[in-house]
Structures are given as structure tokens and as C-alpha cells.
């Protein structure tokens, strides 16, 4: 690792999604987007549903995270995400089906519908579609 990069690890309960040296990243913090360059001051923050943008050797990658925590320390960024997937791994048909289901639940407005859960499902689906370029 050079002094112009930092180690980024994104892990979920199921797997390690990303583990490489990167030059810059932007994470969806709960208080807004957070940019992290090498030698960033130590911090711990919570993450929102959103797209992480990662720069590595002049290329930009996207990883969808659905909440979790991020720690920055000693030129290493560790993301513990509830769920995460690289943009190229996203199954667009599955994300589109999830979007439709969430919209249908929200349109019903019956007492048995958990509105917050449906809104979060919709946000996850829309974020996945956006990351996939849809």
C-alpha cells in the first residue's frame, strides 16, 4: 500500500464484498455523504442505505450498502454492512421486482402493512437500480 492509498474492506454477515487498496471513497453516512482520503482522521460513523463510490487507479466502482457502520483508522477503512453488493453483481430483474412489490404495498395502505418496512424496501430497490444504471 502506498501513501496515496488506503485499505478498504467491506464485509457483511454473509461474505467479504471488497478488500483492496483504494485512493478515495465516498460513503452514504446517516448525516450525509462522507469522503475519505488516505491519512484521514480516525472516525466511526453509521451508514445509511446508499451507494459507496470507490476510486482505485483512476477507475470508479460502486457498491450498494444497506446500512451498517464504518470505521476509519490507521489508513484502513472497515465497513460492516447489513448487506452489500458491487454494482456489477446486481440482478436488475430482482431489484425491479422488489421495487414493484414495495410500491404495491405502499399503495394498499391497509392496517396490516408495515409502512416503514415497505419504504425501506423501496429505498433499497431504487438504490440498487440506480447503482446498476437503470
From Swiss-Prot:
Entry keywords, A to Z: ATP synthesis, Cell membrane, CF(1), Hydrogen ion transport, Ion transport, Membrane, Transport
Organism: Pelotomaculum thermopropionicum (strain DSM 13744 / JCM 10971 / SI)
Family indicated by similarity: Belongs to the ATPase epsilon chain family.
Gene: atpC
InterPro entries in alphabetical order: ATP_F1_dsu/esu_C_sf, ATP_synth_F1_dsu/esu, ATP_synth_F1_dsu/esu_N, ATP_synth_F1_esu_C, ATPsynth_dsu/esu_N
One GO cellular component term: plasma membrane
Record PANTHER family: ATP SYNTHASE DELTA/EPSILON CHAIN, ATP SYNTHASE EPSILON CHAIN, CHLOROPLASTIC
Domain of life from the UniProt record: Bacteria
Protein name per the record: ATP synthase epsilon chain
Subunit note: F-type ATPases have 2 components, CF(1) - the catalytic core - and CF(0) - the membrane proton channel. CF(1) has five subunits: alpha(3), beta(3), gamma(1), delta(1), epsilon(1). CF(0) has three main subunits: a, b and c.
NCBIfam families: ATP_synt_epsi, PRK00571.1-3, PRK13446.1
Compartment list: Cell membrane
Pfam families named among the record's database cross-references: ATP-synt_DE, ATP-synt_DE_N
GO terms, molecular function: ATP binding; proton-transporting ATP synthase activity, rotational mechanism
Main localization of the protein described in the UniProt heading: membrane
Tagged with keyword Membrane: yes
Membrane topology field: Peripheral membrane protein
Known role: Produces ATP from ADP in the presence of a proton gradient across the membrane.
Amino acid at each position: 500500500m502506498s501513501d496515496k492509498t488506503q485499505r478498504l474492506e467491506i464485509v457483511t454477515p454473509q461474505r467479504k464484498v471488497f478488500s483492496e487498496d483504494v485512493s478515495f471513497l465516498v460513503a452514504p453516512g446517516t448525516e450525509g455523504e462522507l469522503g475519505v482520503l488516505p491519512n484521514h482522521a480516525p472516525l466511526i460513523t453509521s451508514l445509511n442505505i446508499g451507494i459507496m463510490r470507490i476510486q482505485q487507479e483512476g477507475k470508479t466502482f460502486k457498491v450498494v450498502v444497506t446500512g451498517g457502520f464504518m470505521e476509519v483508522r490507521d489508513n484502513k477503512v472497515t465497513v460492516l454492512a447489513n448487506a452489500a453488493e458491487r454494482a456489477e453483481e446486481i440482478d436488475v430483474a430482482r431489484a425491479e421486482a422488489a421495487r414493484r412489490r414495495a410500491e404495491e404495498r405502499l399503495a394498499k395502505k391497509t392496517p396490516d402493512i408495515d409502512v416503514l418496512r415497505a419504504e425501506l424496501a423501496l429505498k433499497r430497490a431504487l438504490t440498487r437500480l440506480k447503482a446498476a444504471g437503470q
